[in-house]
């Protein structure tokens, strides 16, 4: 049988599995109505359907050599969306197919492609940028992130990646980030994290449902407002209860724009500065986007075990402290002290005499001048020489990776913005940073 015939039979098999699952749901539904509470013993019909599909599917017992060849060719041929959905479908057939797909399909850092949902929290490619665009809906206070499928700037089609919804509180603003385009809430299973600002819109904290790699049990950085949710009896066991600070974004005060364009700094608590060095990498990349559901009792035990100091961590303070005071404390343990986070700063634009405006080279990806436009590069950090209080810091040597633009964001039309990112940022981190540019800044404009 030719490869084209195998792929055609494979796609037909997906259709038969869908029809079989639909028939099974109907039969289970009628059976549940007849037997009363017997149907309610299962959380969903999917729990019953999965083992049936694995046992009856003719694709489950495919020889590993043939399966490897089929998925390898399919992964190479279906390199772009929407055709890449067939690669995702292969990972949904059974466990053996899923394991083979995980072995063949590489992360975006290596292959430069976004395939599975976990790719949204994995670093982007090192040698190129992943081009995306953000659509803003002012009436609904929502933002949607799409993967560019065409080099054209003003296009309506794209692969949906993430969404966010703005909620204004009395003293702060929150942006809920989700994988669902419509149901954007913290109570949904698609909730990934959030962005929170202070009253002036000058300081932001990015929260993730998964802890950063340098977080220990004695120094967890959690959301202070989540304490009441931890002790509530209405906590859903399917909703990730952790809320960990992975990044801090600061805009320097610039009343009436007297100091020129906006100036911002980003402290990436989950990314070490060593990731930009030769041979460096981002540690502890997630293998699963959302942790597996656990029991309600386990969720209470894991949350109550957090130390009291985790809720009172000073990095959550939105007082008028300086930017340098928002870094990692020297009182932390040796492991955390050795973890020096990556700091990003915006690339300073140049003044154009003829146009009478500040300009940045976006290489054609931004066409409309806006105060929201920015480019982020790695900040050169001083390195201490020797040990002890008398050690004098020395300037770190310039490295080509530190001069590359890691994230750029800009306006191309009404409620349309481009977002391009690369290693070591992930799509989730880049989207959260760009959301901070949308927020109103009373003391920066």
UniProtKB/Swiss-Prot annotation:
PROSITE patterns: TUB_1, TUB_2. Changing residue 244 to F: In strain: cv. Bretagny. Ubiquitous. Residues 382-398 have a biased composition (Low complexity). Residues 57-112 form the F-box domain. One of its GO terms (biological process) is response to fungus. Pathway: Protein modification; protein ubiquitination. Its main location: nucleus. Keywords: Nucleus, Ubl conjugation pathway. Pfam families: F-box-like, Tub. Gene3D superfamilies: 1.20.1280.50, Tubby Protein, Chain A. Belongs to the TUB family. Part of a SCF (ASK-cullin-F-box) protein ligase complex. Interacts with SKP1A/ASK1. The F-box is necessary for the interaction with ASK proteins. Component of SCF(ASK-cullin-F-box) E3 ubiquitin ligase complexes, which may mediate the ubiquitination and subsequent proteasomal degradation of target proteins. PANTHER family: TUBBY-LIKE F-BOX PROTEIN 10, TUBBY-RELATED. This is Tubby-like F-box protein 10.
